[in-house]
């Protein structure tokens, strides 16, 4: 029988493996956003790009996340009932069905871009709105490629191959970087939209051979009567909303920001990118690893083991996001300045983005926890509850936006997301307890208290950055200054992270001790080899 410690150890070990690939992808993402800010800044064109992306990316995200999420339980049923060959049949059939749906959406998007633009840019001035309409038409093919990526992600995650799905940000960001470095001055903002489409295609090209290595074989299948595909589509409908609440909140916020003058939508875009970078590195890894495990345990009725996996997952999320929130609040200004303030991105833009990032960072914990909770619901075949919680989240966010937008600008919009998502987490926990019984709430409270204590110590360490920053700025200038600040910031963050982990270890956190045990084991296993060599 697998105990809670081994469940936590397995999750921790797998998370470490996939996090490395995600981290590399996000490093490329950091350079991509820095280049974007340098070339386009917070201009009218960048406002239009962020608004168009909010619309097309939301549609694409609906398709990708819903398919990747519903693929696993449906594929599990198909494989259990008929064997591995049925899984291939199901995968190819789902690719065909989603491709047809995507083609319809693309045609509608190209024919009716004005209506889609209303989703994200109804408050924009006529000139910006016209650019948004054009960019939506150019960007709509992303929906098709996103559907392919969603299916391949689901296939690989179900097969336990997380490294490839963790690395897909690399081809996406490389596509952007090549465009920004070589072609941006010639093709402009339309080219950036084309790069965003080609980046998703590059992800599919990257995933396909990895899927084929573990048994996937492409075939032309069009069976609209297949019960497993029908089940996946039925499951996907409510999942569309629940897994994309953050995207929906983003599109609502940018819509309101489009009426706040030039640069407001761009400020939200850049701030949200920095905030979601944490989610993209760590939380994506956890949910990708945990979901197949939850599907097999909770889906088969093993509630005891499923709850242990859930407990380890939620606590791991807390151990990552609480210190990340503290760090972002303290270091928001240097992070924004180092990442963006150069070229077309002004110091004034940096000040606005700093305060907005701090408000966005308050949502890190709640967005991450709700992602895990949603996967638990899906694992027990419940897609309706996350749907209702997601709708509630959006309604609260919209209501708060309308109350605070005029008074607090982009800060108010970002804070509204944080408040709405936090309320949604509490609602989701309460409903989940009613559905599956005791959740081990005491262990979560203990974990939260310990991580807050350790995070406060870590936060005190990060304050050491600022006096040295003044010295660096006094002695250097230009690119040398930026590089020096970046290196020292990374050093301070690294030291603070070590102090944080040490504090958790001393506080007796089991998950941290599991990770330390894994590291020690690897070091000890390598010692004999070193001696022999």
Give the ranges of each region predicted by the language model:
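Membrane-embedded alpha-helical bundles of multi-pass transporters/translocases
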Residues: 1-533
């Amino acid at each position: 029988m697998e105990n809670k410690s081994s469940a936590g150890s397995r999750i921790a070990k797998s998370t470490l493996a996939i996090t490395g690939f995600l981290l590399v992808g996000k490093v490329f993402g950091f350079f991509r956003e820095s280049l974007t800010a340098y070339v386009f800044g917070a201009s009218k064109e960048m406002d239009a790009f962020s608004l168009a992306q909010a619309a097309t990316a939301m549609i694409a995200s609906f398709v990708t996340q819903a398919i990747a999420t519903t693929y696993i339980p449906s594929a599990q049923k198909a494989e259990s009932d008929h064997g591995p060959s049925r899984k291939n049949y199901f995968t190819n059939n789902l690719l065909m069905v989603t491709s047809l749906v995507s083609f319809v959406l693309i045609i509608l998007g190209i024919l009716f871009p004005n209506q889609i633009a209303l989703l994200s840019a109804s408050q924009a001035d006529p000139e910006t709105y016209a650019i948004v309409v054009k960019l939506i038409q150019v960007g709509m093919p992303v929906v098709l490629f996103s559907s392919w990526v969603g299916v391949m992600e689901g296939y690989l995650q179900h097969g336990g191959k997380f490294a490839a799905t963790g690395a897909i940000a690399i081809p996406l960001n490389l596509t952007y970087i090549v465009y920004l470095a070589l072609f941006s001055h010639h093709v402009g903002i339309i080219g950036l939209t084309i790069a965003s489409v080609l980046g998703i295609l590059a992800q599919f090209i990257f995933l396909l051979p990895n899927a084929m290595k573990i048994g996937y074989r492409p075939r032309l299948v069009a069976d609209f009567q297949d019960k497993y595909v029908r089940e996946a589509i039925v499951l996907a409908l409510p999942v569309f909303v629940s897994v994309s609440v953050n995207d929906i909140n983003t599109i609502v916020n940018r819509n309101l920001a489009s009426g706040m003058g030039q640069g407001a939508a761009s400020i939200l875009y850049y701030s949200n990118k920095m905030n979601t970078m944490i989610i993209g590195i760590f939380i994506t890894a956890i949910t990708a690893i945990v979901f197949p495990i939850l599907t097999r345990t909770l889906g088969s009725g093993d509630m005891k083991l499923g709850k242990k996996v859930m407990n380890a997952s939620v606590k791991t999320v807390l151990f990552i996001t609480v210190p990340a929130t503290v760090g972002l609040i303290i270091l928001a200004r240097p992070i924004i300045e180092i990442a963006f303030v150069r070229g077309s991105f002004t110091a004034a833009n940096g000040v606005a983005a700093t305060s907005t990032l701090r408000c966005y960072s308050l949502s890190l914990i709640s967005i991450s926890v709700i992602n895990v909770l949603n996967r638990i619901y899906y694992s027990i075949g419940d897609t309706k509850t996350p749907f209702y919680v997601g709708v509630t989240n959006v309604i609260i966010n919209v209501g708060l936006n309308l109350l605070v937008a005029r008074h607090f600008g982009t800060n108010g919009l970002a804070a509204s997301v944080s408040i709405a998502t936090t309320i949604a987490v509490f609602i989701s926990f309460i409903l989940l307890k009613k559905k599956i019984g005791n959740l081990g709430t005491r262990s979560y409270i203990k974990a939260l208290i310990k991580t807050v204590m350790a995070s406060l110590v870590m936060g005190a360490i990060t304050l050491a950055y600022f006096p040295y920053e003044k010295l660096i700025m006094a002695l250097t200038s230009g690119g040398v200054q930026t590089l020096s600040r970046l290196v020292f910031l990374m050093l301070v963050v690294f030291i603070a992270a070590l102090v944080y982990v040490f504090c958790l270890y001393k506080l007796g956190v089991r998950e941290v001790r599991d990770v330390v045990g894994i590291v020690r084991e690897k070091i000890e296993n390598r010692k004999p080899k070193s001696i022999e060599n």
